[in-house]
Amino acid sequence: MANPLRKTMVYLGLADEELDYQQGQQPAQQQQSPVQAVPTPVPAPQQQAKRAPVTPLHKPSTTTRNAAPAEMNEILTVHPKAYKDAQVIAENFREGVPVIINLSQMTDDDARRLIDFASGLSIGLYGKIERVTAKVFLLSPSHVAVSGEQSATEAEVEASFFGR
C-alpha cells in the first residue's frame, strides 16, 4: 500500500483496503477467488412529478394600453400635503381618471419626490404628465387627449421649479 494514488482511492472509498500482512501469508492460489455475478440494480419506476397549483402573487392590471376612448365623466383634483397621498393619485389614475395634482401645500423636496412618482406612474400606464402652472400638474391616461401651447413663461417656471 505504498502507492499514494491507491491510498487516496482507499480514503475516498473508491477501492477496498488490502492488508499487506494477509497477502504475504496466503498462497498464490488462494488469492484468486472465483468470479461471482454481480446483480444489476433495477431502476425504480419514474413517477410523474406532481405539480402544485400556482397562485399568482399580484393581480393582473385592469388598465389596458389601447383603452377605448370613453366619455370623460370626472377629473380628480388632489392637494397633497404629504407623500403618502400618492396612493390616492395612483389608484384613480390606474382606473383611467385624469388627475390634477396641486403641489402648493408641499415642501419642495416632497413635491419633487411626488412628481418623480407621478412620472413613473404615467410612463408605466402609458399616460402623460404635463405641467399646468408652477406647482400644478396633470396626469392624463392614454385615452385622454390634452391640447394646448407651452408659452415662454411656462418654460421659465419649469426650469426654476426643478432647479436647472
UniProtKB/Swiss-Prot annotation:
User: What domain of life does the UniProt record list for this protein's source?
Assistant: Bacteria
Q: Which GO terms describe its cellular component?
A: cytoplasm
Where does the record place it?
Answer: Cytoplasm
A GO BP annotation: division septum assembly
Entry keywords, A to Z: Cell cycle, Cell division, Cytoplasm, Septation
Please give the InterPro entries that the UniProt record associates with this protein: Cell_div_SepF (IPR023052), Cell_div_SepF/SepF-rel (IPR007561), SepF-like_sf (IPR038594)
Q: Where is the composition biased (Low complexity)?
A: 22-49
Q: Where is this region: Disordered?
A: 21-71
Q: What does this protein do?
A: Cell division protein that is part of the divisome complex and is recruited early to the Z-ring. Probably stimulates Z-ring formation, perhaps through the cross-linking of FtsZ protofilaments. Its function overlaps with FtsA.
Family the entry assigns = Belongs to the SepF family.
Assembly and oligomerization: Homodimer. Interacts with FtsZ.
Tell me what this protein is called: Cell division protein SepF
Protein species of origin: Clavibacter sepedonicus
